[in-house]
Amino acid sequence: RAYFRKCLALKHICDYKFYMEIATIILAAGMGTRMNSALPKPLHRIGGRPMLAWSLDAAKAAAASRVITVLPKDSDSIISWLGDQESCIQDIPKGTGHAVKAAKSQLADFHGVALIMFADTPLVTAKTLATLAAAVADGSDIAVLGFEANDPTGYGKLVIDENQCLKKIVEHTDATKTERRITLVNGGVMAVRCPLLFDLLDEVK
């Protein structure tokens, strides 16, 4: 398995449906108010392409058998751009967990790895997604992308135990003084075993 995962991550050999199927949930339901633009945030261009296009391509290159984009109400322009690609609507903006849960009915019978990523992260690669998915396929229930920040101010902190297992993610505003010094921070992408994902989301208040 270690060799398989190495090949998967380094060479983008991502066709491993025989191992564990992947579905990717792309979160594009944010209002994008800070953009101060009539154009929906996911359709703003980076490198000549909409940000959402980069996320979709990365998900497909990581061998996702399904890619579901979560959209806000009144997102006709994004739906038109997506064409026949799968999507769902988050009727009321109630945060990230609620947005992921919007895809629950479409993944009701799915037993595999759910990759969760944001539409406005165009630099996340298929290699990164495949590595996260492989960690879950290898036996973990959840794998979270983290990175070392020179200045961790404002980022969610990844609190790990002595075995390098994730204990919790703490937002900067909720962190203790000690936790605020943690430089390993949340990269905003995770892989979760299904149907465990939605069992956990059902417990979120």
Task: Tell where the protein language model's regions lie, with residue ranges.
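Conserved N-terminal catalytic core of the sugar/cofactor nucleotidyltransferase
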Residues: 15-19, 49-134
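N-terminal nucleotide-binding beta1-loop-alpha1 segment
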Residues: 19-37
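Short beta-strand/turn micro-motifs composed of small residues
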Residues: 28, 71, 118, 146-147
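Short glycine-enriched, charge-decorated loop/helix-capping segments at active-site entrances
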Residues: 39-45, 204-205
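Conserved core of the sugar-phosphate nucleotidyltransferase
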Residues: 76, 124-204
